[in-house]
Amino acid sequence: MAREHRVLSRLSAGFPLAPNSFLFCDDDEIIGAPFQVMERRHGKVIRRELPEECNARPDINRRIGEMMIDALADLHMIRRDDVGLEDLGHPEGFTQRQLDGWTKRWKDAGAADNTDMERLIAWLYQHRPTLEQSALVHNDYKLDNMLVDNSEPWRAVAILDWDMCTSGEPLADLGYLLNQWAQPDDPPLWIEESTMPTAQSGFPSRTESIERYATQTGYDCDTIHWHYAFAAMRFAVIIQQIYIRYVRGQTQDDRFATFDTRVATYIDKGCRIASL
């Protein structure tokens, strides 16, 4: 929360989709926990299901897809020193630290030996991009972390959940978004796992989205499939962390009983992206 306040209280002056954060208080005695006072934005969140006004409207769906890419591109074009965030994070070595960190989390998550995951991790290390670009990175950018206009859902009102924002490789955000960007010709399990309705008629394809992002930012996107594969690996680790807590009896929620199948889906996805 403190990090989010720091980011938004500065970024909001230079990036219209960042709601302002007016106050952060870490004194537990006031309301019983730390709290934050933020600007209110009015809009709605789109998750797996499209709003009623988008049904059978591929033209609207395309505009929603383009809006997601445009908003991300606009964020990545913000100069950190223009908004007082030049000292946020450590962009040097960002990709290597991310790969090391998520590999360690996988090993710590109690997973049984998994040949496919070992192959995917080895490929990620062998092909880690050497070119490092630097921008403000949201780190959890997807459609349901946005507010869109109530009557014009192709118009963004705000981007939410900035608690993991840092400085690093901008393609990490794009790869993360692509991992949730299903399209009609994807395997059924990929579509089922997606948190976004992009497999519906009209949404741009992943390739079109990459091209639009590259045109708008000028960033080198030659290594985007590495970041896409890494995002799939990262999701596998996150779900494995939840699954192992269930196996160990640390949570009783029976929804987690089949999460091993979801882990396998993301590992397979990462391997396919990497052509393994």
Predicted regions and their residues:
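ATP-binding pocket architecture of kinase catalytic cores
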Residues: 1-119, 123-136, 150-154, 276
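A short acidic, glycine-rich active-site loop
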Residues: 57-65, 195-202, 257
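All-alpha amphipathic helical-bundle segments outside canonical DNA-binding/catalytic cores
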Residues: 89-90, 220-231
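Catalytic-loop of the protein kinase fold
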Residues: 136-138, 143
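Hydrophobic residue at the +6 position relative to the catalytic HRD Asp in the kinase catalytic loop
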Residues: 146-148
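Activation of the activation-loop gatekeeper triad in protein kinase-fold domains
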Residues: 159-165
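Active-site activation/catalytic loop segments of kinase-like enzymes and analogous catalytic loops
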Residues: 172-217, 231-249
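Regulatory N- and C-terminal appendages and interdomain linkers associated
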Residues: 237, 241-276
